[in-house]
């Protein structure tokens, strides 16, 4: 049973990200400086983040629908692009391996991959889909060793569901125009 207010935590983290971006712990340290004094512990932020990531696709779809009531969207054209975030760490994240079977259960997000700056640091890739006005519709996060080419179609399928199957023109730079992406978009 959840004993804290998820909406309160989400609201506080959103305000804090806009006003004074910090780590979750750094943000929690500023809790008493806000006019509205939230009533939750640091552990509740971490538990909320687990809930948020487990429901991220549904949450992003909900955000799109709610924000569409405030700012009408023009989804006749959808823009997609990817970027990388570098981390000043010595090595990539470890794989999580099943101790019994030896099976790799998951790979950490920070991995060595191709970055435009050719830096020797692990990276995380983010893909973002925006409407014709440049307002985000959805996003995805991937390990840095994943090609951006394989991220477009799954995110586009999610956007198609969010838009209830509405037609739109897919627009991306040449790096995101592989045969498989063009084939998917030509199928209507």
Which functions belong to the PLM regions below?
Residues 1-108, 120, 127-140, 145, ...:
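Dynamic "connector" segments at or just before major functional cores
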Residues 113-117:
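Conserved beta-alpha junction segments in alpha/beta enzyme cores
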Residues 148-188:
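An internal, acidic/charged active-site-proximal segment
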Residues 123-125, 179:
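Short beta-strand-initiation
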């Amino acid at each position: 049973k959840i004993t804290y207010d998820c909406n309160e935590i989400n609201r506080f983290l959103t305000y804090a990200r806009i006003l004074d971006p910090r780590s979750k712990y750094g943000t929690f340290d500023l809790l008493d400086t806000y006019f509205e004094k939230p009533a939750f512990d640091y552990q509740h932020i971490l538990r909320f983040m687990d809930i948020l990531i487990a429901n991220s696709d549904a949450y992003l779809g909900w955000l799109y629908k709610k924000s569409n009531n405030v700012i009408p969207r023009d989804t006749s054209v959808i823009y997609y692009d990817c970027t990388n975030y570098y981390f000043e760490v010595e090595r990539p994240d470890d794989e999580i391996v099943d101790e019994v079977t030896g099976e790799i259960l998951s790979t950490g997000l920070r991995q060595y991959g191709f970055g435009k700056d050719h830096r020797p640091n692990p990276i995380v890739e983010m893909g973002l889909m925006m409407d014709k006005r440049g307002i985000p519709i959805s996003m995805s996060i991937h390990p840095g060793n994943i090609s951006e080419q394989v991220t477009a179609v799954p995110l586009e399928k999610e956007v198609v569901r969010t838009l209830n199957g509405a037609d739109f023109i897919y627009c991306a730079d040449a790096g995101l125009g592989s045969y498989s992406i063009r084939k998917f978009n030509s199928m209507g």
